[in-house]
Regions:
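Short linear loop/turn motifs
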Residues: 113-123, 237-244, 324
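C-terminal motif of bacterial Sec signal peptides marking the signal peptidase cleavage site
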Residues: 18-22
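Peptidyl-prolyl cis-trans isomerase
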Residues: 208-249, 283-285
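N-terminal targeting/tethering segments
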Residues: 24-137
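PPIase-associated folding chaperone regions across multiple families
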Residues: 26-28, 35, 132-212, 244-370
Length: 370
């Protein structure tokens, strides 16, 4: 099949490399890992890592500055460069494992797909000058192999998830609509907009006010009572497998059996809630939840199959070789045109969990990669 998108390798802008630091080059033919004895070359892994760095630079630097890659942004003892490289080499392992199991699902690349991959790789090389190519460590063979692996991954995922159970019962999919008022038990905004903590006396008074509000809502409507008490009515949906609502709130909602039913005052650690069941079955939300369940089953199956293959394989990473890949320079993207995104694409988006970075195009850089 000829699919519509690759990893949009040739689309929205021109990248410029800067801030060069000790760029002595790397040997693209060096073995960075082995998979059941198969040598995985550094060239593809390096290209994937630099591609991801180039894509992320503008966003990260706008928030965290030029030292982003050497910073421990999340306080876990790992720099952003280390974290990104760890994700990339994990992706590389996945790609080659999937390639080695193509026969398990009768997955092949058509002549048309292979030709499109070759054309895209050649176009990428033609669109970038020598300095740009060196900055990403790209060769036509490396780009071709990377796009081949990504395309195989997409086709393998499609084949694997075809076995997922897509039969979701109405009961499992059912999603209800509700309205609610929530009132903070701990703090409030004063006239100047500053956050103030309630005193114990104020907390007792607040509890009484919320009870009176509930009684007013029961006598009139939730909306009318909210207007009277200066509260805001919000809305939401919930299903039986909801994991985001407080347990007390979900239990109260599940106890409402008829549309229009009002809950008692529900108390959580930080809020009071008054809830109203609006629709036992929200048709649109129910269908959306059905698709979410199917999507989760597909992802779970894909991950289970892939992990099984990985468990059975022997992947050995040469840490010293992988350490040679560094993000010593930074990239800036200049958007030229969005039309090219439609004209230069070749394979479907890979699955959401494929960890492949998208949107790199023409690059202007000066790093040497051998």
């Amino acid at each position: 099949m000829v699919t519509k998108k690759f990893t949009t390798l040739l689309v929205s802008g021109v990248l410029a490399a800067s801030m060069l630091v000790g760029c002595g080059g790397i040997n693209k033919n060096e073995t960075v890992a082995t998979l059941d004895g198969q040598e995985i070359k550094l060239g593809v892994a390096n290209f994937a890592a630099r591609l991801q760095q180039a894509e992320a630079d503008d966003f990260y630097r706008s928030y965290f500055g030029d030292e982003v890659w050497t910073s421990d942004l999340y306080g876990n003892g790992t720099t952003m460069e280390e974290s990104t490289k760890s994700n990339v080499i994990g992706m590389i392992e996945n790609l080659y494992v999937l390639q080695n199991h193509m026969a398990d699902y009768d997955v092949t690349l058509t002549d048309e797909e292979t030709a499109k991959i070759a054309d895209t790789a050649a176009q990428f090389m033609a669109d970038n000058d020598e300095k740009a190519i060196n900055a990403l460590g790209a060769t036509e063979d490396i780009v071709n192999e990377y796009l081949t692996l990504v395309t195989i991954q997409s086709k393998m995922r499609t084949a694997i998830i075809a076995d997922a159970d897509t039969n979701v019962s109405d009961a499992d999919a059912n999603t209800s609509a509700y309205s609610y008022v929530n009132v903070s038990k701990t703090s409030y905004k004063d006239a100047e907009g500053n956050t103030q903590e309630y005193t114990d006396d104020e907390k007792a008074e607040l509890a009484d006010t919320v009870r009176k509000f509930h009684d007013a809502a029961a006598d009139t409507t939730l909306d009318t009572a909210a207007d009277e008490y200066g509260y805001t009515v919000s809305s939401g949906t919930f299903a039986a497998d909801n994991t985001t609502l407080d347990e007390e709130v979900l239990t109260a909602l599940e106890g409402l059996k008829n549309e229009g039913d009002l809950s008692d005052v529900v108390e959580t650690d930080n809020y009071y809630y008054v809830l109203r069941l609006d629709e036992i079955t929200d048709a649109d939300a129910t269908e959306q939840h059905r698709q979410e369940i199917i999507s989760q089953r597909q992802s779970d199956l894909y991950n289970e199959v892939l992990q099984g293959w990985k468990d059975d394989a022997e992947w050995v990473l040469n840490e010293k070789v992988w350490e040679k890949v560094t993000f010593g320079n930074l990239f800036t993207t200049t958007v030229e045109s969005t039309e090219a995104a439609e004209d230069n694409t070749a394979a479907d988006n890979t699955a959401a969990d494929n960890a492949v970075t998208e949107n790199t195009e023409s690059v202007d850089g000066t790093e040497s990669v051998q």
